[in-house]
UniProtKB/Swiss-Prot annotation:
Pathway: Amino-acid biosynthesis; L-lysine biosynthesis via DAP pathway; LL-2,6-diaminopimelate from (S)-tetrahydrodipicolinate (succinylase route): step 3/3. HAMAP family: DapE. Its cofactor is Zn(2+); Co(2+). Zn(2+) 2 binds at D103, E138, H352. Zn(2+) 1 binds at H70, D103, E166. Gene3D superfamilies: Zn peptidases. It is an enzyme of class 3 (hydrolase). Homodimer. Binds 2 Zn(2+) or Co(2+) ions per subunit. This is Succinyl-diaminopimelate desuccinylase.
Length: 379
C-alpha cells in the first residue's frame, strides 16, 4: 500500500464530524514536525486549526507555497444506507469508501506525503512550504481558516501561492481546477403590512401583494454580465413566509430570504444599493438586514496556475479547465493574504453523499501533482 493511501485510511478512520478534529491534525503535525516544520495550533471556540511552515534556504526572502484544507467532514446521514461503515475505510471495486475519502482526506494525505518526498529529494529547497489546516470548513467557518489568516496577517506573514485541496475534478482527476469563487451575500427582508380580516381588505394592507411587484422586478433584474472568468451574478429567493396559517386573515408582514452569488463584476455596496432602490421605488415599508459570507476572489493565469497545469498534464495527460463555478470555499479567506489561490483535488461526484469514495488509481497521481508543483515553484 502506498504511503498516501495508508495515510488517507488513517484519516478516514477518525470520525472528524465538524468541528471535531478527532486528532487528525495531530497525525499530520507529527509527520510534518519530523520534517522540520514549525507547527502552531490555533484553537478557537472548539475549533482546531494549525499553521505549519518549513523555511527554505532563502528564508523569508524566498517564495512560500502553502497547502490549505480541512480535516472536518459532514455528518454521515443514515448509517443503515451505507454499504460499509463510513469511518471504516473499505476497499471495493477499485474504490476506497468512507466519509471524507473525496472531501478531503485524500488531498490532506497527498499534501503531507508530497511534502515528505519533496524535502527528501530537495533538502536544500530555496522556497518555503506552509500548511493551513482547519476543522471548521464544513460548519459555520467562523473559527477556522479565517482565524488563522487573521493571525498570520497580524504578524505580517504573506503567502505567495496556495493550493486548496477541495475536490474540484469532475469526470476524471485533473479535468477542472478552480481559480476563483463567486461571493455570497444574503438578505433578510421584512415587508410590513396591516393585519386584518380577509373579507375587509380595505381595512388592512396585504404585504404579500405589496411585495409581489418588487419581487418580480428583483427576479428579472440583470445584475451584471459577468466577465472572462465569472458567469453573471445571480439573485435567488430561498425562503418566503407570511400569514398565520388561517384562510381568513391578511398577514401583517411578509418575510423574504434571498441570496446573491456575485462575481468580481459587481460589488457588495453596488448590489445592496440597487436592491434598496427597487424596494424604495415600490414604496414598501420594510427592514432589510444583510449578511456577507464571502467576497469573490480570482487568480488570473500566472505562476501557480501554469505550474499546476503543467503538473496535471505531466501526471495524468489531462488538460485542466479553469473554473469559478460552485459555492464558496475557504479560498475566500486565504486570498486576503495570498495573491495566487487555486483549488485542486479529486473528483467530487460522491462528496457529502452516502457511500462517499475515491477511485484508488487517483490517490498517488494526486500526490504527485502536488509534489510536482513544489518542485516547479520552490525547489
Amino acid at each position: 500500500m502506498s504511503a498516501t493511501l495508508a495515510l488517507t485510511e488513517q484519516l478516514i478512520a477518525r470520525a472528524s464530524v465538524t468541528p471535531d478534529d478527532q486528532h487528525c491534525q495531530q497525525l499530520m503535525i507529527e509527520r510534518l514536525a519530523a520534517l522540520g516544520f514549525e507547527c502552531e495550533t490555533i484553537a478557537s471556540h472548539g475549533v482546531t486549526n494549525f499553521w505549519a511552515v518549513k523555511r527554505g534556504t532563502a528564508g523569508r526572502a524566498g517564495k512560500l507555497l502553502a497547502f490549505a484544507g480541512h480535516t472536518d467532514v459532514v455528518p454521515t446521514g443514515p448509517l443503515e444506507q451505507w454499504s460499509s461503515p463510513p469511518f471504516v475505510p473499505t476497499h471495493r471495486d477499485g474504490k476506497l469508501y468512507g466519509r471524507g475519502a473525496a472531501d478531503m482526506k485524500t488531498s490532506l494525505a497527498g499534501f503531507v506525503v508530497a511534502a515528505e518526498e519533496f524535502v527528501a529529494a530537495h533538502p536544500q529547497h530555496r522556497g518555503s512550504i506552509g500548511f493551513l489546516i482547519t476543522s471548521d470548513e464544513e460548519g459555520p467557518a467562523t473559527d477556522g481558516t479565517v482565524k488563522v489568516v487573521e493571525a498570520l496577517a497580524a504578524r505580517g506573514e504573506r503567502l505567495d501561492y496556495c493550493i486548496v485541496g477541495e475536490p474540484t475534478s469532475t469526470a476524471t482527476l485533473g479535468d477542472v481546477v478552480k481559480n476563483g469563487r463567486r461571493g455570497s451575500m444574503s438578505g433578510e427582508l421584512v415587508v410590513k403590512g396591516v393585519q386584518g380580516h380577509i373579507a375587509y381588505p380595505h381595512l388592512a394592507k396585504n404585504p404579500i401583494h405589496l411585495l409581489a411587484p418588487a419581487l418580480a422586478e428583483l427576479a428579472a433584474e440583470q445584475w451584471d454580465e459577468g466577465n472572462e472568468y465569472f458567469p453573471p451574478t445571480t439573485w435567488q429567493v430561498s425562503n418566503l413566509r407570511a400569514g398565520t396559517g388561517a384562510t381568513n386573515v391578511i398577514p401583517g408582514h411578509a418575510d423574504l430570504l434571498f441570496n446573491f452569488r456575485f462575481s468580481t463584476a459587481s460589488t457588495v455596496e453596488g448590489l445592496q444599493a440597487r436592491v434598496h432602490a427597487i424596494l424604495d421605488r415600490h414604496g414598501l415599508d420594510y427592514t432589510l438586514n444583510w449578511s456577507v459570507s464571502g467576497l469573490p476572489f480570482l487568480t488570473p493565469r500566472g505562476e501557480l496556475s501554469n505550474a499546476l497545469d503543467a503538473a496535471i498534464r505531466a501526471e495524468t495527460g489531462v488538460s485542466p479547465e479553469l473554473s469559478t463555478t460552485g459555492g464558496t470555499s475557504d479560498g475566500r479567506f486565504i486570498a486576503r493574504i495570498c495573491p495566487q489561490v487555486i483549488e485542486f483535488g479529486p473528483p467530487n461526484a460522491s462528496i457529502h453523499k452516502i457511500d462517499e469514495h475515491i477511485d484508488v488509481r487517483f490517490v498517488d497521481p494526486l500526490k504527485n501533482v502536488y509534489r510536482r508543483v513544489l518542485e516547479q515553484l520552490i525547489a
